[in-house]
């Protein structure tokens, strides 16, 4: 094994006179299958192509882009693992100081809108080269889209970047096919029938076909209703089984999106994860302190891709297909860890976007794709959904048996609503007994039914039942474990009254969020469509959207009502929401009046501020109940 060449010296050391492809990326180079760039470059290498990696080139100087010369076949360009604007800015649009995907962890090594900047430089320097853009930034900006940072609707990134093609989604199969045709001497136009790509033609050259036409760029700029219609159609056709070709007019050009590429089957996915990854970063990064993003995933295993949960704020349904690896492939990867002297016996995760999905959502999905008219899990599970953890459980059991494996953890998100639909408790029991490292992260996100409906999430009753069962099992097994709930403020549909309801829920359930995630409007999601338009694209009804910094800060403060610094904002929010009854000295109140500010100790005196105080208030080491946060449910059952 060896890292791919990162500079002309390393290219010459391999005896190459030229490279076939230059892969330009906005992250530091990490050769690990949790990083998309590693997968695509290793797939190209395995197909016999000479690939050079140009990692975080200096965009203010042409030298980095010139060092390899013009590649024989073309350039692949990606911003990296995440959108460069999300990497650079907080939801409050403040510049971040750190960057998990950059050596040394410092921000500033890639430009804003990295795909566009890199691609334009390449087009200027190599006017006739083929440029293919991909990854999350390009994929989620493939249509006209709302840009939160400019607060405007922008055209498809294909036009701003001057690239030839967008490879959207996970990318392996279309990359292999595009590379094959280019190597056979075909022009870029000969790639236009490949699934999983977008390209553009002049309106005068367009040959009418059977397609779904979206409202044009000009129309979605002028009409929020048209924007919502476009967003719904984009998602409806983002299915590899039933998705149709989409077109969207941009001035004198037409953007054409071919149907999604079929997801990798199990054999293909096994192949991708069997490639000779170094599972580390090159030596040149050591002096900078390494790449922080590798630490969390170094000894993790991805056993699946995609998610049929389809939360409205998540891009997975729009970006990933759905596929699973074979048990043997997962076992083989775990065995490879045993030969690594850095491995201490702990597998940090066996998961994916959602850890506990292995099956298609239903039999219909295989032949007809996912339904347009309803979600599989929300607001209630579809009666046709097939629920089983048998395959996943079998994999976990085999991993636990391996000599040299001390612990196998699950740190990816568990879909608790799917878990609660399983008629067998076998997986739940083994999850609690073997696979939690003290904390189990799950994502109820909110408690208000109205907000959860806008999110595409199950109602809070399911979460309560899940917690009740979790703590019963935890107590029975004498485990000191607790749940870490992810909660979100200011999602479209969330009023101040909803935020107050969430604060009261946290108080009742003894939840103390250490951090609060404000809704972040990123390109390509239904929730972002709601944020921009104030319209739910599924119902075309108006949606309340908290947009002012004042209200968003009040919603955040309500979730952390127990922090003294938030007291003034909490009081202001409660007054504005018509809930003065929650300001006072009664145990039901969230805060005390401002007149006693100097004496204010909060409602959680003596407790650590943690994600969830269940750590201190669930059960003691003997498994006996201490402060039982679910006592009210148990009393009802007596």
PLM regions and their residue ranges:
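N-terminal [4Fe-4S]-dependent radical SAM core
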Residues: 1-18, 28, 225-300
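Glycine-rich beta-alpha loop elements in corrinoid/cobalamin-binding modules
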Residues: 10, 36, 55-250, 257-258
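Flexible, glycine-rich loop/tail regions that form catalytic "lids" or insertion modules at the edges
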Residues: 13, 21-25, 66-67, 194-197, ...
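Conserved SAM/AdoMet-binding glycine-rich loop
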Residues: 23, 58-59, 336-484, 488-492
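N-terminal pre-triad scaffold of radical SAM enzymes
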Residues: 24-29, 288-312, 338, 346-348
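Terminal amphipathic helices with adjacent charged low-complexity linkers/tails
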Residues: 60, 189-238, 252, 261, ...
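Flexible glycine/acidic-rich beta-alpha junction loops that bind and position SAM and/or redox cofactors
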Residues: 83-92, 140-142, 172-177, 202-205, ...
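Conserved, mostly hydrophobic/aromatic
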Residues: 164, 272, 307, 330, ...
